[in-house]
């Protein structure tokens, strides 16, 4: 079983432009792919899946009407998530990481918290969403936390374990496979920089709304193929 797959679901807006649709429709189609992955992937092949739902730049630099649509869509999607039978029959725990408590409207915060609380005792699989998240901001906050701890306790040993415990992702294992859709073969704003230090990367030109479960399976097959080569 793969312990942890992270997905940067890029290309929703490009898909919308190509198909003559609105950005909102692009995000909606992307959510359909997320649903498909959730329904099919937690079958004993993957333990943890993390989706990057919104960066800080997404929330700060995009037009306000688009940001408000994002908030509305997140609220709708998370409510729908809790109705999936797979979430409950497969005991999938939902986590939401990032600065959503600082940035999101209260109603959306309430919906997110309900999803977290409703699944907190599930332990077979973990479904994580990064919302209001940038990797460089995560690391800056970790450094600030460690600095404050060191001031309070000069004898504190600063090591890799302490850094990990200071991250949003402190309860998650390192990322084994990072998938990025949308034809952008690079990382962005330090995405999960600590947890992807030894990850395999899988880049595809396919925009996320066209990233079917078949394409997801291809990424997993390639990951295992690379692993076999490395083991020789």
Where are these regions (language model features)?
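Flexible, compositionally biased loop and terminal segments
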Residues: 1-232
């Amino acid at each position: 079983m793969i312990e942890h797959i992270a997905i940067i679901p890029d290309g929703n807006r490009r898909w919308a432009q190509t198909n003559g649709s609105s950005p909102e429709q692009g995000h909606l189609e992307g959510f359909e792919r997320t649903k498909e992955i959730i329904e099919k992937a937690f079958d004993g092949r993957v333990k943890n899946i993390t989706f990057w739902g919104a960066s800080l730049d997404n929330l700060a630099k995009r037009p306000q009407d688009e940001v408000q649509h994002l908030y509305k869509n997140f609220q709708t999607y998370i409510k729908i998530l809790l109705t999936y039978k797979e979430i409950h029959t497969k005991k999938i725990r939902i986590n939401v990481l990032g600065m959503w408590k600082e940035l999101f409207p209260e109603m959306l915060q309430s919906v997110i918290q309900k999803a977290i609380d409703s699944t907190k005792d599930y332990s077979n699989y973990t479904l994580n969403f990064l919302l209001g998240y940038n990797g460089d901001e995560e690391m800056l906050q970790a450094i600030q936390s460690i600095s404050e701890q060191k001031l309070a306790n000069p004898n504190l040993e600063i090591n890799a374990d302490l850094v990990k415990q200071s991250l949003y992702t402190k309860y998650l294992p390192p990322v084994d496979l990072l998938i990025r859709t949308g034809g952008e073969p690079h990382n962005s704003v330090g995405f999960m920089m600590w947890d992807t230090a030894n990850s395999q990367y899988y880049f595809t030109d396919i925009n996320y709304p066209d990233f079917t479960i078949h394409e997801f399976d291809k990424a997993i097959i390639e990951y295992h193929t690379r692993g076999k080569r490395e083991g020789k």
